[in-house]
C-alpha cells in the first residue's frame, strides 16, 4: 500500500468497524416461529455491538424469547389486535416510538403494518432497512413442474442481511437461549417433577393440515417409544387439540400432556432439559431449537429448502419423502391436490421412531 494512503485506508477500516447508529429499533410482530428465528441473530448482534442499544418491537406474548438477552437489548411488547388495529393505529404507535429517539430501524417483517411504520420513519429522516423475502424465487420451489429445490437463504440469513445494510457486520454464533446451560428446572418442578430418566417432547400439531403427521401414525411412534422404555413423553397440545391426544395419556404410562400450564417461558425451560423434540414444521420446532435441544422434524406440504429449518437443526433429522407434487406450499396452507396428503401418510412410523431413538 502507498505509504501516504495508509492512514486514509486505516481510518476507513476503523470507521467500518464502528457502528454508525447507537439506538436501533428491530421490528418483527409475528408469527411465533418467525419471531423465534430472530433470537439467534439478535443475540449475536447484541454481543458483537455492546455499545449499541437494540429494542425489539413484537407481540407482547413473545417476551420470554428475549428475557435472556444481553443488557443492551430491550423488549417492547404490543397487542396489535387490541390496541393497534388499522393504519391510524400504526401512526399512534409511531408517535409513541418517536419518544425513544431511534436513529435506525430494521424491518424484519415486511408486511403492511411494518411498511407503514417504515414510511413514517423515512418521512422523519430516520434510516430504515427492510427484509427481502424473495417471494419470486420461493414460487419456483412450489410450482407444479420443474420444481427448483435449491436451498434458499434461511430466515436467519435474511435477518442478518437487513442488519448488515445498516452497517452491522457480525457472525451468527448462538448455542441456546439459556447461554451455555439449561433453564432453571426447579421453577417448573411443581408441574413436571424432577428429572431422573430420559425426557422427550412430542409436538404433533401445526397451524395447517398439510404440516401435521396423521395422529394415528404419530400414535404408533408414541407407542414404540413407550415400549422402548422412555419414561417421560411430554406431548404439547393446546385447547381443542388436547381432546385429540388425551387417549394417548390414558393408554401409555410415559405420556403426559403439556397444555398452557407452563406458559411459553416454562415450556422453553422444559424443552432445554429434553434429549430430543419430535415436531412438525411448526413453532415448537423453532422453540426447541432455541434451547439447543436436538429436533427431529416431519415435513409434508412444506420443504426445508425454503429456508425455515430450526436453528442448528441437522438436515438428516428432517423426515420427508420425495414426491412429484411436493412441496406444494411455502407455509403449508394449501390443501392437498389429491385430498389424501400422501406426503405425510407415506412416512413410515418406524422411520420416525428410529430417528428419535438415536438420541436416547
Model-predicted regions and their roles:
Residues 1-360:
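Catalytic machinery of carbohydrate-active enzymes
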Amino acid at each position: 500500500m502507498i505509504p501516504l494512503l495508509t492512514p486514509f485506508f486505516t481510518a476507513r477500516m476503523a470507521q467500518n468497524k464502528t457502528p454508525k447508529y447507537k439506538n436501533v429499533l428491530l421490528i418483527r410482530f409475528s408469527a411465533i416461529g418467525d419471531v423465534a428465528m430472530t433470537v439467534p441473530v439478535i443475540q449475536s448482534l447484541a454481543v458483537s455491538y455492546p455499545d449499541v442499544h437494540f429494542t425489539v418491537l413484537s407481540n407482547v406474548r413473545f417476551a420470554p424469547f428475549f428475557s435472556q438477552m444481553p443488557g443492551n437489548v430491550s423488549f417492547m411488547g404490543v397487542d396489535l389486535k387490541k390496541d393497534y388495529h388499522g393504519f391510524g393505529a400504526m401512526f399512534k404507535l409511531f408517535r409513541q416510538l418517536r419518544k425513544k429517539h431511534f436513529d435506525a430501524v430494521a424491518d424484519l417483517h415486511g408486511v403492511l403494518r411494518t411498511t407503514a411504520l417504515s414510511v413514517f420513519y423515512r418521512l422523519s429522516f430516520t434510516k430504515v432497512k427492510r427484509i427481502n423475502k424473495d417471494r419470486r424465487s420461493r414460487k419456483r420451489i412450489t410450482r407444479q413442474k420443474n420444481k427448483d429445490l435449491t436451498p434458499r437463504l434461511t430466515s436467519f440469513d435474511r435477518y442478518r442481511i437487513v442488519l448488515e445494510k445498516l452497517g452491522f457486520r457480525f457472525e451468527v454464533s448462538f448455542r441456546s437461549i439459556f447461554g451455555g446451560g439449561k433453564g432453571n428446572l426447579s421453577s417448573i418442578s411443581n408441574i413436571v417433577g424432577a428429572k431422573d430418566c430420559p425426557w422427550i417432547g412430542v409436538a404433533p400439531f401445526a397451524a395447517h393440515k398439510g404440516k401435521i403427521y396423521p395422529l394415528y401414525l404419530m400414535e404408533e411412534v408414541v407407542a414404540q417409544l413407550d415400549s422402548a422404555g422412555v419414561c417421560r413423553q411430554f406431548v404439547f397440545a393446546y385447547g381443542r387439540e388436547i381432546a385429540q391426544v388425551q387417549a394417548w395419556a390414558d393408554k401409555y404410562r410415559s405420556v403426559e400432556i403439556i397444555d398452557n400450564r407452563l406458559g411459553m417461558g416454562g415450556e422453553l425451560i422444559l424443552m432445554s432439559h429434553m434429549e430430543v423434540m419430535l415436531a412438525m414444521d411448526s413453532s415448537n420446532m423453532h422453540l426447541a431449537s432455541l434451547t439447543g435441544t436436538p429436533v427431529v422434524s416431519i415435513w409434508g406440504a412444506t420443504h426445508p429448502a425454503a429456508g425455515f429449518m430450526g436453528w442448528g437443526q441437522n438436515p438428516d433429522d428432517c423426515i420427508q419423502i420425495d414426491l412429484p407434487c411436493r412441496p406444494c406450499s411455502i407455509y403449508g396452507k394449501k390443501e392437498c391436490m389429491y385430498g389424501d396428503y400422501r406426503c405425510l401418510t407415506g412416512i413410515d412410523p418406524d422411520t420416525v421412531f428410529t430417528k428419535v431413538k438415536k438420541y436416547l
